[in-house]
Amino acid sequence: MTTFTHINSQGEANMVDVSAKAETVREARAEAIVTMSKETLSMIVEGKHHKGDVFATARIAGIQAAKRTWELIPLCHPLLLSKVEVNLEPLLETNQVRIQSLCKLTGKTGVEMEALTAASVAALTIYDMCKAVQKDIVIEYVRLLEKSGGKSGHFIAEEK
């Protein structure tokens, strides 16, 4: 069985020592789904939201969040990300927004948490901007889609 890397032999939480690890190109993709009413989604897609461009704001928030993940998640390393991408896709048939993020770097540790944080904060930003018109927006299916470049190998999530 694989052990938790952030727990020492005394059961205490510690940041993993990556100093001896080789630098490799590492990449991770994550997603989040935001479900809302047809009216709220239409308002966003048609650009009629009184706070401005919801997707542009959520995209920038996700990018900023990825860069600051180490400040939010206690045992994450500060990383020099070489790429952060956040894409938002309206799914009109299900009244949802699919958020997909991509983080990439050449380094000693993975970027899964950065990708997950980017997708999560983009979703939270949509909620924040739309809560005045709809309080029961649902954020769900925040998950890692794919990661590559590390010792643990290439991971691809199963389709849901």
From Swiss-Prot:
One of its GO terms (biological process) is Mo-molybdopterin cofactor biosynthetic process. Its EC number is 4.6.1.17. Catalyzes the conversion of (8S)-3',8-cyclo-7,8-dihydroguanosine 5'-triphosphate to cyclic pyranopterin monophosphate (cPMP). Pathway: Cofactor biosynthesis; molybdopterin biosynthesis. This is Cyclic pyranopterin monophosphate synthase. Homohexamer; trimer of dimers. It comes from Haemophilus influenzae (strain PittGG). HAMAP family: MoaC_B (MF_01224_B). Belongs to the MoaC family. Gene3D superfamilies: Molybdopterin cofactor biosynthesis C (MoaC) domain (3.30.70.640). Substrate binds at L75, C76, H77, M113, E114. Keywords: Lyase, Molybdenum cofactor biosynthesis. Pfam families: MoaC. It catalyses: (8S)-3',8-cyclo-7,8-dihydroguanosine 5'-triphosphate = cyclic pyranopterin phosphate + diphosphate. One of its GO terms (molecular function) is cyclic pyranopterin monophosphate synthase activity. NCBIfam families: moaC, PRK09364.1.
